[in-house]
Amino acid sequence: MASKGKPKPKPRPRGGAFRGIADAGFRKFQSREALGMYIDNPSAYMGTRQLGSTPANADSALTVAGQVICYDDHFVSIHDKFPKASVHALLLPRDPDVYKEHPIVLLSRRDEAGEAFRQAVCVEAEKLRTILAGELQRRFGQFSAADAAREAVLRGDAELDGELPAGRDWSKEVIMGVHARPSMNHVHVHVFSRDMHSEKMRHRKHYNSFTTPFLVQLDEFPLAPDDPRQPFAVRTQGGLSSETADDAGDNRDMKCWRCGRNFGNRFQELKRHLDVEFEAWKKE
């Protein structure tokens, strides 16, 4: 009687090269360290499609969550893996001397090196903002009243008289900032559209973390040492003010970013309202 051998292991499904590298990177940099894989080896996460190429479907390169947009020796720009708006990217410094510092402390430094770093971050964030603004115009310009003349020329419905009309300034719809209490260990700047329209925005904390003082915008830096959004060790006075968001706004009322309507803790009602506001915002 033949003896039974050990069952053969089931073959693992074969993914693409990007998937394999990404999985390996995620195993090395897990949880709060996950952004480290982009800093460590950004070329592994570029994917197969580059900016400016023609997408195979309605999604463009800027909608590929978790992929790198661009990088150099000093910074990496990536698509947020869990975008909370129509376009949402992260800017990651690559300098190991600073990338584990608290972003509020780092961007509030007033010494020469701190000023130089903050200026470099602002320059790179503006570049990323321009990229995202272009993506907003590409996606939503056809709906915008301010882009009507430009879109008519692009469609061939109007003659081009001189230069192509600039149309809507979509860069004004893009916000840049860092969280007062970041969820990831590596310094990362959020660069995102203000519409807050995404299936990945699933609860109150998500919404309030981007629409309250918990998000410190880049043009607010440097913060004063006693600003309540500073880490406790840095502050020179008392505890957190009720006007800040140490808990990412878990207990704050949710207010529409566009009209200011207060939804209290009624998240699903807010989501339905944001769908309506999104359509109106596109048409401005």
Predicted features and spans:
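Long, charged, low-complexity intrinsically disordered regions
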Residues: I131, G141-E151, S209-T236, L240, ...
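Aromatic/acidic cage segments in peptide-binding pockets
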Residues: L92-D97, V105-E115, F192-D219
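Intrinsically disordered, low-complexity domain-flanking/linker segments in eukaryotic proteins
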Residues: L107, G134-D169
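Short histidine-centered catalytic/ligand-binding loop motif
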Residues: L90-S144
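Intrinsically disordered, low-complexity regions enriched in proline, serine, glycine
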Residues: D80, H88, K100-P103, Q137-A145, ...
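Active-site microenvironments that recognize anionic phosphate/pyrophosphate groups
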Residues: M1-S108, E112, R229-E284
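Conserved, structured regulatory domains from eukaryotic proteins
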Residues: V153-G167, E173-I175, H186, F192, ...
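Histidine-centered divalent-metal-coordination microenvironment in nucleic-acid enzymes
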Residues: P93, I175-M196
